């Protein structure tokens, strides 16, 4: 049987895709800047 690959976990989600994680690296800040420029309502998870 094939298991479902997406096993939601709020803590892990934030640790990997969260705002603070994005801010902690140069490229992450680039991501946020891009999303701001595009006008995203939500910048990160």
From Swiss-Prot:
Entry's transmembrane regions: none
A GO BP entry: translation
Domain of life: Bacteria
InterPro entries given in the database record: Ribosomal_bL34 (IPR000271), Ribosomal_bL34_CS (IPR020939)
Any Pfam family hit: Ribosomal_L34
Sections of the chain in a coiled coil: none
Residue ranges of the region described as Disordered: 1-45
Cellular component, GO annotation: ribonucleoprotein complex; ribosome
Keywords: Ribonucleoprotein, Ribosomal protein
Cited PANTHER family: LARGE RIBOSOMAL SUBUNIT PROTEIN BL34M, MITOCHONDRIAL RIBOSOMAL PROTEIN 34 FAMILY MEMBER
Family affiliation: Belongs to the bacterial ribosomal protein bL34 family.
HAMAP family given in the database record: Ribosomal_bL34 (MF_00391)
Protein name: Large ribosomal subunit protein bL34
Organism this protein belongs to: Staphylococcus aureus (strain NCTC 8325 / PS 47)
Gene: rpmH
């Amino acid at each position: 049987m094939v298991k479902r690959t997406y096993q939601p976990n709020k803590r892990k989600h934030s640790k990997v895709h969260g705002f603070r994680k994005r801010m902690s690296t140069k490229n992450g800040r680039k991501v946020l800047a891009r999303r701001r420029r595009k006008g995203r309502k939500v910048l990160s998870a």
